[in-house]
């Protein structure tokens, strides 16, 4: 892929979003190491949820997920990844993607 004429300095190929919990210090660094030139990574941090077993706790997690997605939209990201193992383990396989897609 060649750069368009007069490209922006960063993110001329793509801008990617990643949502991480506040305690995660690895995801952003690894994404930035993995992307090729012209791709930038933009992170949003979610509230840390300790109650992920009750309906109320899960609903709170999903509300905060929606807020994180909305916070990345103004950056013009092409895609958003959810970098939270616990959150993705407690929600049915397609539910998080559907919730995130519904927010974009």
Give the predicted meaning of each segment.
Residues 2-67:
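N-terminal glycine-rich anion-binding loop in soluble enzyme alpha/beta folds
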Residues 68-104:
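Glycine/small-residue-rich loop that forms an oxyanion/phosphate-binding "nest" at active or ligand-binding sites
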């Amino acid at each position: 892929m060649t750069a368009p004429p007069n490209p922006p300095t960063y993110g001329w190929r793509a801008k990617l979003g990643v949502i991480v919990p506040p305690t995660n210090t690895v995801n952003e660094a690894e994404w930035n190491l993995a992307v090729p030139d012209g791709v930038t990574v933009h992170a949003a941090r979610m509230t840390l949820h300790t109650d992920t077993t009750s309906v109320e706790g899960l609903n709170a997690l999903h509300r905060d997920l929606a807020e994180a997605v909305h916070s990345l939209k103004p950056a013009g990201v092409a895609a958003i990844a959810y970098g939270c193992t616990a959150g993705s383990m407690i929600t049915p396989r397609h539910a998080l993607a559907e919730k995130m897609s519904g927010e974009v």
